[in-house]
Curated annotation (Swiss-Prot):
This is Succinate--CoA ligase [ADP-forming] subunit beta. It catalyses: succinate + ATP + CoA = succinyl-CoA + ADP + phosphate; GTP + succinate + CoA = succinyl-CoA + GDP + phosphate. Pathway: Carbohydrate metabolism; tricarboxylic acid cycle; succinate from succinyl-CoA (ligase route): step 1/1. It comes from Bordetella avium (strain 197N). The keyword Metal-binding applies.
């Protein structure tokens, strides 16, 4: 689960991380009132969407008068903000954050993320913070510093100072940087976050350290422990199809291709998508029905997939371990009838009750294309989608 920048800064503030004063706004008038309350003389008008790259996309602007705040708020609020993370369709801006302007002397980058390979938390930092951090990581990876934290021990002062020194933090700000790093780590652990990113972490002309941005992702499996974080959820920022899928315990992510995929198991789903790509196709979605899918669940999965009008063919790829192939077959038949399926459907089933499932499909009277291998299934569905 993601949250907005201003919500992330509320969390950071709770853990003692310095952030600028700011007020969220949901209308132009609220934006002007927020600027008046903050006092100025310089404000930052920030679009609030669940995506990075807002600055380059035109969603973060400086204002030096209340009239300019009004003008910029009118421009940004309601705009379809396109960034490298939103895709070409962009994301509508429904909220703004009006913030005190900052004295920017030097911008750093810092983040915390779980490294599954080492089973530790990685503290990642760079002296090159700001809008071009992705380019820095690509072109000069030596400027990205990584320190692995043992979750049993936690982030030590020595580790935090090592990172501060490695990114060239001046001596008069090192103690502050160490304090901020440790508080960020505490925030990361206590909130069950999967990502905390500050870009930029600013050092002003007086040597003070302050977080000018805040990006959070949270482990959805741990949200039951954090109702206060669930309260931050903004459904307007989420794909309606993904919200609908979650109601039926379906893992669904829409993509840009034209071949719908219905698979049981995340690993098989990714392998299926890779195979479709290998044979020249483009998957329209990731959809994992899980190990305990019912006929109703499969029907709902079809309905969700077909809400995407770009779907030209569907591939159902099932391995019947816990899942029985006859149950999937029943669901496929039911779904085809319920949605009046009008696009080609390729089905591959292997495992428990495989023969019964295939027999049910063959006797259904529906124009279902059968396949025995993943290569055959991918070949047939790619051809059918053309």
């Amino acid at each position: 689960m993601k949250i907005h920048e201003y919500q992330g800064k509320e969390l950071l503030k709770q853990f003692g991380v310095p952030v600028p004063r700011g007020i969220p706004a949901f209308s132009v008038e609220e934006a002007v009132a927020a600027a008046e309350k903050l006092g100025g003389p310089v404000w930052v008008v920030k679009a609030q969407i669940h995506a990075g790259g807002r600055g380059k996309g035109g969603g973060v602007k400086l204002a030096r008068s209340l009239d300019e705040v009004r003008q910029l708020a009118s421009q940004i609020l309601g705009m379809q903000l396109v960034t490298h993370q939103t895709g070409a369709q962009g994301q509508k801006v429904n909220r703004l954050y009006i913030e005190d302007g900052a004295d920017i002397q030097k911008e750093y980058y810092v983040s915390l993320v779980t490294d599954r390979g080492t089973q530790k938390v990685a503290l990642i930092a760079s002296s090159e913070g700001g809008m071009d951090i992705e380019e820095v990581a690509h072109s000069t990876p030596e400027k990205i510093i990584t320190e692995y934290i043992d979750p049993i021990v936690g982030l030590t002062d020595a580790q935090a100072k090592k990172v501060a020194d490695a990114i060239g933090m001046p001596a008069d700000s090192t103690a502050q940087a160490v304090d901020v790093f440790k508080k960020l780590y505490q925030c990361y652990m206590d909130t069950d976050a999967s990502l905390v990113e500050i870009n930029p972490l600013n050092r002003d002309s007086k040597g003070n350290i302050i977080a000018l941005d805040a990006k959070f992702n949270f482990d959805s499996n741990a949200l039951f422990r954090h109702p206060e974080i669930v309260a931050y959820r903004d459904l307007d920022e989420e794909d309606p199809a993904e919200i609908e899928a979650s109601k039926f315990d379906l893992a669904y992510i829409q993509l840009d291709g034209n071949i719908g995929c219905l698979v049981n198991g995340a690993g098989l789903a990714m392998a299926t998508m890779d195979t479709i790509k290998l044979f020249g196709g483009e998957p329209a979605n990731f959809l994992d029905v899980g190990g305990g899918a019912t006929a109703e669940k499969v029907t709902e999965a079809f309905k969700i997939m077909l809400k995407n009008k770009g779907v030209k063919a569907i591939l159902v790829n099932i391995f019947g371990g816990i899942m029985r192939c006859d149950v999937i077959a029943e669901g496929v038949i039911s779904a085809c009838k319920a949605v009046n399926l009008s696009v080609p459907l390729v089905v591959r089933m292997k495992g428990t009750n495989e023969e019964l499932g295939k027999k049910m499909l063959a006797e259904s009277g529906l124009p279902i294309i059968s396949a025995d291998t993943m290569a055959e299934a991918a070949t047939k569905v790619v051809a059918a989608a053309k």
